A protein has these predicted regions:
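Glycine-rich, low-complexity segments
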Residues: 1-24
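Polar, enzyme-active/binding microenvironments
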Residues: 20, 42-43, 55, 63-69
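Short, well-ordered beta-strand segments enriched in hydrophobic/aromatic residues
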Residues: 34-45
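Extracellular jelly-roll beta-sandwich "head" domains, especially the C-terminal globular C1q domain
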Residues: 1, 25, 48-60, 68-114
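N-terminal intrinsically disordered, low-complexity segments enriched in P/E/S/T
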Residues: 27-31
Length: 114
């Protein structure tokens, strides 16, 4: 779903570091700051993010995990119809992931400012 080497619209800042045998989780390495793990729980279609080895979900990310982390939108379970994501380096240095479902784009996570 994400590809083996990089996400679409690769900026050079994000790469897929590891994919487990079943393809159920993805480790992204942000070369400047830290590591993010996106876990897709297939039976619920929810995404979980791991930052600095602390498991967090949706808008419940505590600010203590990383000083620069942003709280993601409440739209976290995007359903089964998810296309490949795009990632962008924003003007403020943060990384944004966008997922497209059937109707519109949601900003899933924007974490780790440079």
């Amino acid at each position: 779903m994400f590809g083996s080497d990089s996400v679409s619209h690769d900026t050079g800042w994000i790469k897929v570091k590891e994919i487990d045998n079943e393809g159920s989780y993805y480790i992204f390495e942000y070369r400047v700051c830290a590591k993010m793990v996106f876990v897709h729980v297939r039976n619920t279609h929810y995404w979980t993010v791991r930052a600095n080895n602390a498991s967090v979900t949706e808008e419940k990310i505590p600010q203590s995990i990383a000083p620069s982390i942003r709280i993601p939108m409440t739209v976290c379970g995007l359903g089964a119809n998810i296309s490949s994501p795009s990632c962008f380096i924003e003007k403020d240095g943060s990384v944004s992931f966008y997922f497209k479902n059937e109707t519109s784009y949601f900003e899933a996570y924007a974490c780790y400012t440079v």
